[in-house]
UniProtKB/Swiss-Prot annotation:
Swiss-Prot/TrEMBL keywords: Cell inner membrane, Cell membrane, Membrane, Transmembrane, Transmembrane helix
Designated gene of the protein: yciB
Protein name: Inner membrane-spanning protein YciB
Domain of life: Bacteria
Subcellular location: Cell inner membrane
Amino acid sequence: MKQLLDFIPLIIFFVLYKTNDIFVATGALIIATAVQVAVTWFLYKKVEKMQLVTFAMVTVFGGLTLFLHDENFIKWKVTIIYAIFSIGLAVSQIMGKPLIKSMLGKEITLPDTVWTRINMAWTGFFAVCAVVNIYVAFTLPLDVWVNFKVFGLLALTLIFTLVTGGYIYHHMPKETDSE
């Protein structure tokens, strides 16, 4: 249910962009993201930091997009969010407390070297997504960017998550039969 909530604002943005324009879609994205945060709080009594960062960025950059009637701000939002995630993961690694381990370490037991590799892989992934978004957003037509934002980045994230899951599975301690 929680993962479904994460996709609702994106779906609303896409549908309203295709049926209206970037400004209607952006306004709806701001509202849908606010509702998403409220519903998450209501259902789980907790909102993840990443979700709050995303909400803040959607509100600020979406608001600038609407107020200045300039689609470039909503395009920058994607890059800035990915950059924040990348920098956050890198800083957590430098401080010796990989954020990925903090998020998943209670459920999954892995050696610290594996957590470090996963944390650095996601650091790189988010950095690459930030750079690719800049390229697509500012060199290709708006329609291409919207499709890339909704489907391309989602597909890349899903694939990278599956690859990470396979890597984690490969490095999980194997249960031994003690009979």
